């Protein structure tokens, strides 16, 4: 942690070590320094000056390689337009540092910690470097407890661990970002904790939607910014690869401060962790490294590990991380999602088939897993109910070929009952979201774990066999389903 004596972080650079640009290839710069004054790897370099049109230039780079002959190769964190050979480069003598603490809440930052929301400067007296070691083994906390989200399918079948790492897997357009927005909304309301959102290489429109959504739902308090519950860090699709590769670390650094210094439980959302790998792959190619499997960088697992190992619970506080993972071509064996799997406590897999049926959230109940779904952690009742739901859905899946060829009438009485219950369960796993009220037209619902278990137990026991399956679609708890069934009966 470094404390900057300059209030409001007015940057002044001491020009101790100055070099100049000798080569520019896209976002990669080669810089020459005087002998004996080479910057360290990961040091931050700053280039200031004017372009040919007289516009001010202020580009931050990060040293990646020492090339010999007093040359270093650095990757730019913003566009290199307007840079020329011979321009002066200042070595800051330290890694990139970003503002941390209460001043970051309610604000949007870019990768180098500058506010980009037009709300004026941020108090940057307390800053922290984005590269730091993971907590030591003896500092880690190993308590097991469930993190309730209020989303039925998640809490019942793949519960999240407090202080754990959760992956949301899905192809394009199946609802990862909407699910993340709902989790931020529910957690801010139910747990009152602080969240940090890292937008890594996703759409600018989604980032803007999220910001507006947070202001409307009160997660960001426009009247009193310091009363907000979330800090946002964006490095969107249009940014150079250097920015997309480091923006996850910037968000993580802000979350670590809340955990280590403020001793809070923090939520870290990363959307999308695949783009972090993708940016690393682009940078790796630009630096001339030999590609590995499927064209990814050879350092894939090292880069992923250095980020993921810092996301953990210590004796001071916890970071619970929820990461969206884009799955290229819906192939879970691709090196990027496969490397991510190794670090996760729970996986929430989103299914295109369920999304096509209109069942949202489109969480696949059979593919999603959690290390927390053990009877000695969640209790016998929860475990038995979850297993009953999975067995019913698995049997329904096995029978689908027979139904497609021969029809329902050819099934035994027992199998027909299983199919009817499975279809009710499938629909009851859908739920109206607060953040999707504009799409669904239904008010959002937060369903507690006790209510969720009670509802599914009633379906499995056969108490609700007489109700039509459409009564279970897009409702909150089971009482709403029975009320909806009564309304349907009256209408018919």
Swiss-Prot record:
Its EC number is 7.1.2.2. It is a peripheral membrane protein. Keywords: ATP synthesis, ATP-binding, CF(1), Chloroplast, Hydrogen ion transport, Ion transport, Membrane, Nucleotide-binding, Plastid, Thylakoid, Translocase, Transport. Signal peptide: none annotated. It catalyses: ATP + H2O + 4 H(+)(in) = ADP + phosphate + 5 H(+)(out). PROSITE patterns: ATPASE_ALPHA_BETA (PS00152). GO terms for cellular component: chloroplast thylakoid membrane; mitochondrion; proton-transporting ATP synthase complex. ATP binds at residues 170-177. F-type ATPases have 2 components, CF(1) - the catalytic core - and CF(0) - the membrane proton channel. CF(1) has five subunits: alpha(3), beta(3), gamma(1), delta(1), epsilon(1). CF(0) has four main subunits: a(1), b(1), b'(1) and c(9-12). Produces ATP from ADP in the presence of a proton gradient across the membrane. The catalytic sites are hosted primarily by the beta subunits. This is ATP synthase subunit beta, chloroplastic.
């Amino acid at each position: 942690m470094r404390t900057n004596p300059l209030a409001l972080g007015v940057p002044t650079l001491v020009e101790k070590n100055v070099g100049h640009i000798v080569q520019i290839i896209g976002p990669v710069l080669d810089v020459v320094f005087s002998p004996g004054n080479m910057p360290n790897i990961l040091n931050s370099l700053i280039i200031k000056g004017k372009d040919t049109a007289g516009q001010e230039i202020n580009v931050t780079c990060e040293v990646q390689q020492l090339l010999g002959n007093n040359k270093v190769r650095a990757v730019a964190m913003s566009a290199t337009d307007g840079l020329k050979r011979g321009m002066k480069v200042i070595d800051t003598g330290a890694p990139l540092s970003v503002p941390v603490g209460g001043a970051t809440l309610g604000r949007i930052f870019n990768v180098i910690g500058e506010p980009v929301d037009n709300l004026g400067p941020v108090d940057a007296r307390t800053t922290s470097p984005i590269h730091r070691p993971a907590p030591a083994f003896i500092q880690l906390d190993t308590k097991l407890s469930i993190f309730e989200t209020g989303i039925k399918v998640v809490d019942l079948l793949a519960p999240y661990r407090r202080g754990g790492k959760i992956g949301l897997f899905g192809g394009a357009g199946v609802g990862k970002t909407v699910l993340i927005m709902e989790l931020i909304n529910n957690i801010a309301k139910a747990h009152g904790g602080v969240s940090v959102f890292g937008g890594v290489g996703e759409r600018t429109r989604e980032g803007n939607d999220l910001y507006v959504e947070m202001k409307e739902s009160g997660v960001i308090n426009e009247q009193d910014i310091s009363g907000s519950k979330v800090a946002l860090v964006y490095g969107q699709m249009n940014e150079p690869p250097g920015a997309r590769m480091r923006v996850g670390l910037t968000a993580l650094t802000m979350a670590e401060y809340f955990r280590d210094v403020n001793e809070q439980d923090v939520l870290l959302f990363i959307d999308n962790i695949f783009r972090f790998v993708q940016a690393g792959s682009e940078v790796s190619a630009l630096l001339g490294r030999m590609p590995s499997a499927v064209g990814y960088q050879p350092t894939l697992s090292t880069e992923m590990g250095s980020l993921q190992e810092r996301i953990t619970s210590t004796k001071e506080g916890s970071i619970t991380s929820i990461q969206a993972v884009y799955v290229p071509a819906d192939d879970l064996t691709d090196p990027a999602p496969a490397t991510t799997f190794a670090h996760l406590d729970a996986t929430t897999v989103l299914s295109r088939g369920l999304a096509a049926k209109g069942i949202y959230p489109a969480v696949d109940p059979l593919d999603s897993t959690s290390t927390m779904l053990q009877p000695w952690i969640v209790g016998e009742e929860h475990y038995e109910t979850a297993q009953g739901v999975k067995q019913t859905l698995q049997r329904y899946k096995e029978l689908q070929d027979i139904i497609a060829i021969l029809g329902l009438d050819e099934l035994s009485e027992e199998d027909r009952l299983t199919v009817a219950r499975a279809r009710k369960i499938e629909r009851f796993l859908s739920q109206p979201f607060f953040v999707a009220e504009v799409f669904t037209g239904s008010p959002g619902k937060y369903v507690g774990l006790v209510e969720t278990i009670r509802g599914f137990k009633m379906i499995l026991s056969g108490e609700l066999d007489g109700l039509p399956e459409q009564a279970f679609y897009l409702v909150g708890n089971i009482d709403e389903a029975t009320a909806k069934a009564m309304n349907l009966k009256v209408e018919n």
